[in-house]
UniProtKB/Swiss-Prot annotation:
Keywords: Cell cycle, Cell division, Cell shape, Cell wall biogenesis/degradation, Cytoplasm, Peptidoglycan synthesis, Pyruvate, Transferase. This is UDP-N-acetylglucosamine 1-carboxyvinyltransferase 2. Cell wall formation. Adds enolpyruvyl to UDP-N-acetylglucosamine. Belongs to the EPSP synthase family. MurA subfamily. It comes from Streptococcus thermophilus (strain CNRZ 1066). The gene is murA2. The modification 2-(S-cysteinyl)pyruvic acid O-phosphothioketal is found at residue 116.
């Protein structure tokens, strides 16, 4: 069993460069199946989710060349075949293959997706959109087959999303890119990652308008071609490092940051009294003095990102006073709370809210990452704590944070990965 060992209490200093966005690249790679030519992605993060997606593409007959942060994918050999269930079941973003395979072949046979257990994240919205576009859904054991009649081309449709959903918005875009006719998505999610996927599709020859707004229109085309695309910076990784720098840093510059993707998060930090300087593509976080507590309520973009409430929680424990966190998107995103309490934090879940009292001096302890962003919170807590922290279940962390051990070591952290 692999684990991360941290000897905490050391102030960190230096620079860290944010990698390409995980939540973009896990959709961009499946999107490439729609292309009739080679597609190159630059700025691809070194995370296990990418490794798994590459393996899926190769099993299906595509070819992949990887050179550092550059990924070259030739999808022309991809076959119309059932997906490899092992990798599919471990990876929630595998559902993006539904849309891309539907767009290419008129059907997709896939295992049901895995990923972090954060409470209800149903794919009903995805399936409702596919049905509106002429597909039928069949359950076959642990797999699901989504298909048009006799593999016909999927049809454009007018779709209203009952709930704002990043995954369903992207999946509908993928299916619609080569559909017969126009697709309109109303109540679409507005996240930067959706704009990134739309940019790739348009660079491949698709006709997507309105990405980043509540109404997206896609005029289906018959074919898409190869291109080259730069993945946007990971705003969640950036926010995680910014919160970490405020909690345990004595001067850290976070590079490759797009401020406009983090405005609601930065506003909360400013309300706490965090001292930082925003530059064109970087943020410098100073060593902090006294901090004030704030309340956080997550909401769809451009609101406070649910993916940032856990990485920010250890920083909140440094504030003098009481505050609360309400996650309106994923109700079970509280599994980091008992682990932080194990480290001495005055924090608990009351009535569906996280309530904290600070400031708290954390102590090292054995803890377990229950999901990706909870893992990031525990890493920050371990860096803040007196003594040694041992984090298990670290596969969650490694699937979303590129080179995190190396990056933190370069900042002066006493952190290492142990292979038991």
């Amino acid at each position: 069993m692999r684990k991360i060992i941290i000897n905490g209490g050391k102030k960190l200093q230096g620079e860290v460069t944010v990698s390409g966005a995980k939540n973009s690249v896990v959709a961009l790679i499946p999107a490439i199946i729609l292309s009739d030519g080679v597609v190159t992605l630059d700025g691809v993060p070194a995370i296990s989710d990418v490794d798994n997606l590459i393996e899926i593409i190769e099993v299906m007959g595509g070819s992949v060349k990887r050179d550092g942060e550059t990924l070259e994918i030739d999808p022309r050999g991809v076959k119309d075949m059932p997906m490899p269930f092992g990798k599919i079941n471990s990876l929630r973003a595998s559902y993006y293959f539904y849309g891309s395979l539907l767009g290419r072949y008129g059907q997709a046979i896939v295992g049901l997706p895995g990923g972090c257990d954060l409470g209800p994240r149903p794919i009903d919205l995805h399936l409702k959109a596919f049905e509106a576009m002429g597909a039928s859904i069949f359950y076959e054991g642990e797999a699901m087959r989504i298909a048009t009649d006799a593999g016909q081309r999927i049809k454009g449709a007018h779709i209203y999303m009952d709930t704002v959903s990043v995954g369903a918005t992207i999946n509908t875009m993928l299916a619609a890119a080569k559909a017969d006719g126009r697709t309109v998505i109303e109540n679409a999610a507005r996240e930067p990652e959706i704009i990134d996927v739309a940019t790739l599709l348009n660079n491949m020859g698709a006709r997507v308008r309105g990405a980043g707004t509540e109404v997206i229109t896609i005029e289906g085309v018959e074919s898409l071609h190869g291109t080259r695309h730069q993945v946007i910076p990971d705003r969640i990784e950036a926010g995680s490092y910014i919160a970490m720098a405020a909690a345990i840093g004595k001067g850290i510059k976070i590079k490759n940051v797009l401020y406009e993707h983090l405005e609601s998060f930065i506003c909360k930090l400013e309300a706490m009294g965090v001292r930082m300087t925003v530059e064109e593509d970087a943020i410098f976080v100073e060593e902090q003095g006294d901090l004030k507590p704030v309340d956080i309520k997550t909401s769809p973009y451009p609101g406070f990102a649910t993916d940032l409430q856990q990485p920010m929680t250890p920083l909140l424990l440094k504030a003098s006073g009481r505050g609360k966190i309400i996650d309106t998107i994923y109700e079970k995103r509280v599994n980091h709370v008992p682990e932080l309490a194990r480290m001495g934090a005055d924090i608990q879940v009351l009535g569906g809210q996280i309530v904290y009292n600070g400031p708290t001096q954390l102590s090292g302890a054995p803890v377990k990452a229950s999901d990706l962003r909870a893992g990031a919170a525990l890493v920050t807590a371990g860096l803040m704590a007196d003594g040694q922290t041992e984090i298990t279940n670290i596969e969650f962390i490694l699937r979303g944070y590129s080179n995190i051990i190396e990056n933190l070591s370069d900042l002066g952290a006493d952190i290492r990965l142990i292979e038991d």
